[in-house]
Amino acid sequence: KAANKGASIHFMDIALREYHFPISDYIISDTLSLVENIGLVAKAASTIAQLDVPQHIQEQLDKLSEPNATHKQIAQSLFTKTNTLLLNGLVSRSHSDFSLIRSYINILASLTNSNLGELTSGANSVGAYITGCIPHRNLLGQSSQAGLNALEIASKNHDLMILYGLEIDDCLYDQILTKALKGSKKVVVFNSFMESVINDHADIVIPINTTYESKGSFINLTGQVQDFNQELLLPNHYYSNEALLTDLVNERDLDIPSFNDFIKELESFIDQSIANRNYIKEFPVKTSNSSPIDTTNTFNMYSIDAILRRSRPLQQTKESRTIT
């Protein structure tokens, strides 16, 4: 829609992909050169801006080669256009030098007064962060004592392991997680489909509805909260995931937080987050034993969740055979 309304669209990627809208510039880079190409756009922007750049940033940019005409053109468009947006995608997020890429993009956004956006591998990664469903955050992004991350959870045997809406094929650490399922004393799985690994190693399996039979909300790329309610299409007596979880919480006599109160706080939190830009202006520490990796984790767009993986028509499309 933005392109059709006259927006200038620029891409930097490791492959040429098919898009159905006008593209102003498209830089195709190998994996190792991707970091430098992003840095070169930032270097071109620093020259155009003619601002006093912090010394540590200028020294890092000076280590790069000279920007070419395309780098300069992309940088120039970020100054001449209004309401500019930089989107960081999945290729860079799975890159071994993602921290450096993120620093360059943040510096570029700061120099050009651009907004920043993140394309994540999950549809509701921001929601998980804001609701405290990650190891080092509580509700609304408040810091907390760090718990275990996904790899740490998968690398240990537990007295009790609970998987909710998660299939082994969803995990980067699938083999490690399978070992944890085998070694844990009690395994409880909430899922919409049965896998052989779950069938072999789960002690309790509780069926739940798919996303397409549920209600919920997510925060989109622009910071808007969007709601959906697929339960409206189902019979009144249909047992929802929400009712299931509520019953389990009530059995433990635990307090259930008010979702409506949370939404009110969330709106203010999002507004403040958008208004208060907090650009990263530091570079990651380079470790002496680090070595470049010339591959990135790639994804088949029709294999990212249980429903898509099981759709035979989608698996026969051209896109299902294209790694993105």
Describe the function of each predicted region.
Residues K1-N276, T324:
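Non-catalytic alpha/beta scaffold blocks inside enzyme catalytic domains
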Residues I101, I263-T324:
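Long, low-complexity segments enriched in small/aliphatic residues
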